[in-house]
């Protein structure tokens, strides 16, 4: 038996030398010697016929051979796998001197950029940012704002009604009147950005959904000069410090007096063009009363900005639909950092 074990040891190492460069052959060798019906298994079965004294010696030699085969095969497999990996890495070697690939960096949507610009301005002036429901009751969307049932001004804001008492808000003024009630007659300075909805036919300049940002100030001794200065700050922030504005009378049921604000554009021939950008006015006394303010003690002003209109004028865009088509060719023009976007 000892001679047989010695011969098997020689046989294993001879086969190993022939097949150690092939992983599949090593697996076959493993199965041949260590498998369930392999050479060592059959050798172990032969122990049963040996005398007790020889059985112990032969069993020990078989275990030594088994451990030698296991460790040797494991070592050769690791060497072979490591060599294969190194060869693969050499084939896929990276040249660190090559220039890196440029990739597109995301940026805020142009409408959000304008909202953030306005928000930063008003936060620096001590205003708070308030947001609210896009589905609103008729009471807060119209009645609290001096537009009772049947008021003709409701026709100015064709609405999407969900049921007789609920609709998609037509402005963010619903946020303002709720905040006024929450303050219980105290002063406030807020802006309220968000999406609003009106039953308009979609075309180059109209959309049934658009972005709006409204502002509201309530305090003692507020007058029209405060409103005018605020409007100048807005236009200078958005269009430059030299930008002129033109104020003209208008009508809104929730402000009195009410005005429209136009940008004054001087053409090359010296003539002037007026582009409407927002509406504003002093808060109507009835709106103050509705929110439990005493109009004899408190006054206020409000303004509403259509974000898409500002963006279209600022960036000379001729179709509002561009903001909502998600065309990366359009949007990347407004990326704040275009360093890595040149070849996208």
Curated annotation (Swiss-Prot):
First-level EC class: ligase
Keyword DNA damage attached: no
SUPFAM superfamilies: Class II aaRS and biotin synthetases, tRNA-binding arm
CDD domains linked: PheRS_alpha_core
Gene Ontology, cellular component aspect: cytoplasm
EC number: 6.1.1.20
Record text on cofactor binding: Binds 2 magnesium ions per tetramer.
Keyword Repeat: no
Keyword list, A-Z: Aminoacyl-tRNA synthetase, ATP-binding, Cytoplasm, Ligase, Magnesium, Metal-binding, Nucleotide-binding, Protein biosynthesis
Catalytic activity: tRNA(Phe) + L-phenylalanine + ATP = L-phenylalanyl-tRNA(Phe) + AMP + diphosphate + H(+)
Alphabetized GO MF terms: ATP binding; magnesium ion binding; phenylalanine-tRNA ligase activity; tRNA binding
NCBIfam families: pheS
Family from the record: Belongs to the class-II aminoacyl-tRNA synthetase family. Phe-tRNA synthetase alpha subunit type 1 subfamily.
Protein name, as recorded: Phenylalanine--tRNA ligase alpha subunit
Gene behind this protein: pheS
